[in-house]
Amino acid sequence: MAVRIRLKRFGAKKRPFYRIVVADSRSPRDGRFIDEIGYYNPIAQPAEIKIDVEKAKKWLSVGAQPSDTVKSLFKKEGIIGNSVSQ
């Protein structure tokens, strides 16, 4: 089972709010997920990011691959360095 760390969209039209979730790569964007590890609110000024660092590191250690957007959020929060390969 390929596991991805990605964003699950919530919020109203043109007012997105995202939860950072761990999900099977085959499930739909807003479908079933395995674990929720945080949230991201791009509308707030500055953008609001809350990530459970322990859960994120645990999932990365067992092989979960972050999406490009989640990878950039992890870099902003200092969870991963710049030398992480795909």
Curated annotation (Swiss-Prot):
BP-aspect Gene Ontology terms: translation
Keywords linked to the UniProt accession: Ribonucleoprotein, Ribosomal protein
Pfam families: Ribosomal_S16 (PF00886)
Similarity field: Belongs to the bacterial ribosomal protein bS16 family.
Protein name: Small ribosomal subunit protein bS16
Source lineage: Bacteria, Bacillati, Bacillota, Clostridia, Thermoanaerobacterales
A GO cellular component annotation in the UniProt record: small ribosomal subunit
A GO MF term: structural constituent of ribosome
